[in-house]
């Protein structure tokens, strides 16, 4: 795959047909899967490739907790926690205060205030995804990884959520990789993208200008 260099505030979309390795790439960069081979991987000042080579699981877990934020296609909310507690979970795990100005701004921007005391089962799919977006940025990670965040939504709500997510990334100065099968949605925002192409025995990621 081509070399990736993401500046703070930059967003790169990864597109392609189902089953072509988009999510696998995201999970590998998110340190959820171990790569079969790896050249360089740096996240800010951290040499992730060296940590992987040393199999330093403690350090890798710390990177996942502090430097990475995830938005899963399913939302991934814990069903036994209310919305407010789901959002604050990454901060609690790091020993951070539940009070955060940027989290409150994100809650307001995504219109989640009336939902904070509800359990995930009481929310619509779109509402759960909005909660997942706020949770992913609650601890101000360096890199946001979003796997098909709009896949279960109708076109109107998909566009609205995508716009809100990009707004949060811009405001907080994060880097973001967003996997999407919706080329038209990605294109409408003018995002640079990698397109995953299935080839015999491999997946190739091609830069699309």
Each PLM stretch: what is its role?
Residues 47, 99-115:
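Conserved ABC ATPase "signature" region
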Residues 138-142:
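A short, proline-enriched helix->beta-strand linker immediately N-terminal to the Walker B motif
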Residues 81-88:
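Short coil-to-helix segment of the ABC ATPase nucleotide-binding domain corresponding to the Q-loop/switch region
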Residues 144-147:
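Catalytic Walker B motif of ABC-type/P-loop ATPase nucleotide-binding domains
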Residues 119-129:
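Conserved ABC ATPase signature
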Residues 133:
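Hydrophobic anchor residue at the start of the ABC signature
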Residues 48-69:
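ABC ATPase NBD coupling module
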């Amino acid at each position: 795959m081509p070399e990736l260099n993401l500046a703070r505030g930059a967003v790169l979309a990864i597109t392609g047909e189902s089953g072509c390795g988009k999510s696998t790439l995201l999970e590998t960069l998110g340190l959820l899967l171990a790569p079969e081979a790896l050249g360089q991987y740096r996240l800010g000042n951290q040499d992730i490739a060296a940590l992987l080579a040393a199999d330093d699981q403690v350090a890798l877990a710390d990177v996942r907790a502090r430097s990475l934020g995830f938005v899963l296609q399913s939302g991934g909310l814990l069903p036994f926690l209310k919305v407010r507690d789901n959002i604050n979970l990454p901060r609690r795990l790091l020993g951070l205060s539940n009070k955060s100005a940027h989290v409150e701004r994100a809650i307001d921007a995504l219109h989640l205030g009336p939902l904070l005391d509800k359990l995930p089962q009481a929310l619509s799919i779109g509402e759960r995804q909005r909660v997942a977006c706020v949770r992913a940025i609650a601890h101000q990670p360096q890199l946001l990884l979003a796997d098909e965040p709009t896949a279960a939504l109708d076109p109107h709500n998909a566009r609205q959520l995508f716009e809100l997510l990009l707004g949060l990334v811009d405001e907080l100065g994060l880097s973001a990789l967003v996997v999407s099968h919706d080329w038209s949605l990605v294109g409408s925002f003018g995002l640079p993208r990698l397109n995953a192409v299935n080839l015999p025995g491999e997946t190739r990621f091609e830069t699309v200008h």
